[in-house]
A protein has these predicted regions:
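Beta-propeller folds
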Residues: 19-438
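Bacterial Sec-dependent N-terminal signal peptides
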Residues: 1-23
């Protein structure tokens, strides 16, 4: 209700501001998209390149390579109309392998909740032969049904994904062989590698599955929601998406939904050794009713970062765990008088010797720089403004890049701080710069 009221208030204020300007508005102008902010979307830098990026064409039939320098197209990387053994005419999204030699193409995307969806994925190799030609063959990732959250291994030789709440692994070097990593996944009971509804909604993520830096281990969060109360609501045919099964009579949708004071999922972190096929449970020290909103492997394959929150969500702890011994060591704690924002999790970026952390400990959201041992090296930003997104660190000149609202709460600009602490604004035009448009 609060979200609806806020949205309505925003619309009314927006309309009122236009009315005060003397320009009358009509319904057609409001719904036509005339007032939608202008922006660039779908720009994906090509890994290991540094000079080019890619975009889908408007028809979603091609992936085109562009030059950063000129903004002009260089070549078509993929074309559904000409690719060999391609069974689809259009696609929904795509991603690159870390080395930039493969494309993972998503089709038949079906939404589940706010961030989650299933899709049928295909692999397309960008490797060239001695004549500089791509083999132009499309291969299905799996014949077992639609997948969730597929992710490449760092060496690009494997893809892990989730289907029916279980984790699967496809190895390209072994004829795209598929093996099952977990066995106990079950709807409304156990989820492996994907969050339950509460985690997805409150912590804004849809994948709880990571490869180690050396591609030898998989880490994942297991969600046991067997003790979470169920909630049901009627489902109708609707229009987006149109559910044919309920055209004449409504159906029921039942899922696990913990109301205030009810039990949440029991969460645990596990690792899977790809070679030995051994699964281990990590020894994480956390409250019985606490949360694990993120896990992430560092550059060191023997250090798995595990982030925990207490039930009140005002105390964050980060542990480094050894994926084989399962021993975990606390390296950081951050506390808030109110709560820890979920944006904090995604602003933790690991480098070989350091990691970044964004905190409100000073009263404003600012960037801090830590050693991998958990020692605070310095506070990078300071002042009466908020750092919104940490974009990255340049090891060559020890510079930090971030967005902040220093000029206005209504704007977000890109800044750089060099090794001497000098801050430079990099974005010339006023507006809002989304982190996905500049972070690489």
């Amino acid at each position: 209700m609060k979200k609806i009221s806020f949205a309505l208030l925003f619309c009314l204020c927006t309309l009122a501001s236009f009315a005060q300007s003397g320009k009358p508005l009509n319904l057609k102008e409001i719904v036509s998209g005339e007032f939608i902010p202008q922006g660039i979307s779908g720009v994906i830098p090509i890994p290991g390149d540094g000079e080019h990026y890619s975009q889908m064409n408007v028809d979603k039939t091609q992936i085109i390579k562009y030059s950063f320098k000129t903004g002009k197209p260089v070549e078509v990387l993929f074309d559904a109309a000409t690719a060999r053994e391609c069974t689809f005419k259009t696609f929904d999204s795509y991603s690159f392998s870390p080395d930039g030699t493969k494309l993972l193409i998503a089709t038949e995307t079906t939404p589940i909740y706010r961030h989650s969806y299933t899709a049928v994925h295909y692999i397309y190799s960008l490797k060239r032969n001695i004549n500089g030609e791509i083999n132009n063959i499309v291969e299905k990732l799996s014949d077992g049904g639609p997948q969730q959250v597929p992710v490449f291994s760092p060496d690009g030789t494997m893809v892990a994904f989730v289907r029916d709440n279980n984790i699967y692994l496809v190895k390209f070097l072994y004829g795209n062989s598929e093996s099952q990593v977990t066995e106990d996944g079950k709807r409304n009971a156990v989820l492996n590698g994907i969050p339950d509804w509460v985690y997805e909604e409150e912590f804004s993520f849809n994948r709880a599955l990571e490869f180690s830096a050396d591609s030898k281990m998989i880490a994942y969060i297991r969600f046991d929601e067997t003790e979470v109360p169920s909630y049901s609501f009627p489902v109708f045919a609707g229009s987006n998406p149109h559910i044919t099964a309920f055209e004449k009579y409504p159906g029921d949708y039942t899922y696990k939904y913990p109301k205030t004071g009810e039990a949440n999922s029991k969460v645990s972190v596990h690792t899977f050794d790809i070679k030995s096929k051994v699964t281990r449970k990590m020894q994480v020290q956390m409250d019985a009713d606490g949360y694990i909103p993120r896990i992430r492997f560092t550059h060191d394959p023997n250090k798995l970062a595990i982030i925990t929150l207490n039930r009140h969500q005002n105390r964050l702890d980060m542990y480094f765990g050894d994926p084989r011994s399962t021993v975990c060591k606390q390296v950081l704690r951050d506390e808030s008088d109110a709560y820890i924002k979920e944006a904090v999790f995604d602003n933790i970026i690991f480098y070989p010797e350091n990691f970044s952390f964004v905190s409100e400990k000073s009263g404003y959201n600012h960037l801090y720089w830590y050693s991998m041992g958990g020692n605070l090296l310095k506070q990078v930003t300071a002042g009466n403004y908020e750092v919104k997104d940490f974009l990255g660190w340049d090891a060559d000149d020890n510079s930090f890049y971030f967005t902040s609202n220093e000029e206005s709460p209504l704007r977000k600009a890109v800044y750089k701080i060099d090794r001497k602490g000098k801050k430079t604004k990099l974005s010339a035009q006023p507006g809002i710069i989304p982190p996905s448009s500049v972070r690489t």
